[in-house]
Amino acid sequence: MEPRAGCRLPVRVEQVVNGALVVTVSCGERSFAGILLDCTKKSGLFGLPPLAPLPQVDESPVNDSHGRAPEEGDAEVMQLGSSSPPPARGVQPPETTRPEPPPPLVPPLPAGSLPPYPPYFEGAPFPHPLWLRDTYKLWVPQPPPRTIKRTRRRLSRNRDPGRLILSTIRLRPRQVLCEKCKSTLSPPEASPGPPAAPRARRRLGSGPDRELRKPEEPENGEPTAAATARRSKRERREEDRAPAEQVPRSPVIKISYSTPQGKGEVVKIPSRVHGSLEPFRPQQAPQDDGSQDPEVLDRESRDRPSCAPSASIPKLKLTRPVPAGADLPPPKIRLKPHRLGDSEHEPVYRAELVGELNGYLRDSSPAPCADGPAGGLADLSSGSSGEDDDFKSCPQGPQGREGLAFLVSCPEGRADCASESACSSDSLDEARSSGSEGTPADTGDLSPGHGASAPSVSREARQTVPPLTVRLHTQSVSECITEDGRTVAVGDIVWGKIHGFPWWPARVLDISLGQKEDGEPSWREAKVSWFGSPTTSFLSISKLSPFSEFFKLRFNRKKKGMYRKAITEAANAARHVAPEIRELLTQFET
């Protein structure tokens, strides 16, 4: 008898493994084997649509067709679509152990008809195990693919990767001094309002000048006679000496050192108000009019008002005392350049008086070292880079008592001021770095020994400086020969150096030769435009080197970004890219 859908067949359970039954059934001359799964468990395939309830029909001919009745071991009859087999401890007929089928999830299919492939839609149960068994290597419905959450890699500054544009770099000299150092070195500007009094603080161990606590007074404000009697003479003397408003001061410092001649020197640094910018005045030798008592000098230093705003204490400069017969130093003058036209080649500088560090000109006194030309240069250049040490060694020409000496401080802590000629090229190359709009530099440099002298000015009229004009003759040339014999022409691609940046490629825009009216040695400088930057600068000819010849020496392999882009632009502008340059550019690209 051929099996058909809905018929019942006795099966033989061969093995039971983890809720699955391995069964065999013989139908005529053919034998079938398979695995029956427990559909009541939630592991594996579950939620299968149950079959329609079959009619209770005696299938005695089916059993007779095998020629034998089922044995006792084969008494358990398995039904397709039924639940788990009955428990082993109770042997009951299959009809009584068959549970009620759950309500069908999908409409039941008529007996004997199967779809070509199981329908699948959202929320539908998994197909029947026999359907999966009959569809090996065929189309099998799969659940929808689950969404895989991918974490997006965070870019720098949350930028779109397609819009990563290299920002332009502005080649400007870096600031060497901080705000405190600049306020210490530059003269304070006069503020419209009254100067703010320094905050009175009590500091431990402030030396012999620390405040003494006054004895308590009664509520009516009148001190008692006993408290007055207990006061010592020293307390009353210090209370009378102290000003109305107590200001914390620094302790008195004494420093002893030996001179090359073997003599011992002692420098006494008097007490000063915290935050004052008054420079250190070393104790001078006794004068003809008689020496003053150190206590009197100490009292005068206390009573001197502090007219400078509160700031940090400047660095102490220990200089040797100046001989008594030294002349007074000339006043300091700053030169302000005026904007030049397109056709002008002679820059005109206006001279104006530069105030002292504390904002006013002090009265005449034995010439202190801090006010001399060398001391002034040292004060203006202190705190900057190591190259400023050359600035202190400028030769000082002999100056008269009423002579005017030009002095220009390096702006923003610029170095390269070591030159004997007026407006030296080394001091103008980095200080005159400007933007593409061609803004002129703030100051020029004139060393004291070579400046033009003005008419004699009385000491009372030092506050006003007569108009003074210094004309510097400049000439534009197309090419120039350096000291080592190389020729630099307009349009050349060269390497240039600015403080705070690596060697950077640039194009020469103009070459200027300068000379003073009195025939002093000229200087040679070039105006260059930087590749990859909108800025232009004035550099000394001696600081320029050819781009191709010095490529291996100047190229920095560690720099990326705009530096690499500027190198590529300079190589293309040179109209030929040497093989070694191309190899270096492509070797380190990422």
Swiss-Prot record:
SUPFAM superfamilies, sorted: Tudor/PWWP/MBT (SSF63748)
Region annotation (Disordered) ranges: 52-110, 182-347, 360-398, 426-467
Compositionally biased intervals (Pro residues): 99-110
Residues of the signal peptide: none
A Pfam family per the record: PWWP
Modified residues (Phosphoserine): 84, 186, 206, 250, 447
A molecular-function term among this protein's GO annotations: NuRD complex binding
GO CC entries: nucleoplasm; nucleus
Keywords: Phosphoprotein, Transcription, Transcription regulation
Compositional bias annotation for Low complexity: 376-385
Description of post-translational modifications: Deubiquitinated by BRCC3; leading to its stabilization.
Matches recorded under PANTHER family: DNA CYTOSINE-5- -METHYLTRANSFERASE 3-RELATED (PTHR23068), PWWP DOMAIN-CONTAINING PROTEIN 2B (PTHR23068:SF6)
Summary of the function given for this chain in its UniProt record: Chromatin-binding protein that acts as an adapter between distinct nucleosome components (H3K36me3 or H2A.Z) and chromatin-modifying complexes, contributing to the regulation of the levels of histone acetylation at actively transcribed genes. Competes with CHD4 and MBD3 for interaction with MTA1 to form a NuRD subcomplex, preventing the formation of full NuRD complex (containing CHD4 and MBD3), leading to recruitment of HDACs to gene promoters resulting in turn in the deacetylation of nearby H3K27 and H2A.Z.
Subunit and partners: Component of a MTA1-specific subcomplex of the NuRD complex composed of PWWP2B, MTA1 and HDAC1 but does not contain CHD4 and MBD3. Interacts with MTA1 and HDAC1. Interacts with MTA2, MTA3, HDAC2, RBBP4, RBBP7, BRCC3 and ZNF516. Does not interact with CHD4 and MBD3.
Protein name in UniProt: PWWP domain-containing protein 2B
Organism: Homo sapiens (Human)
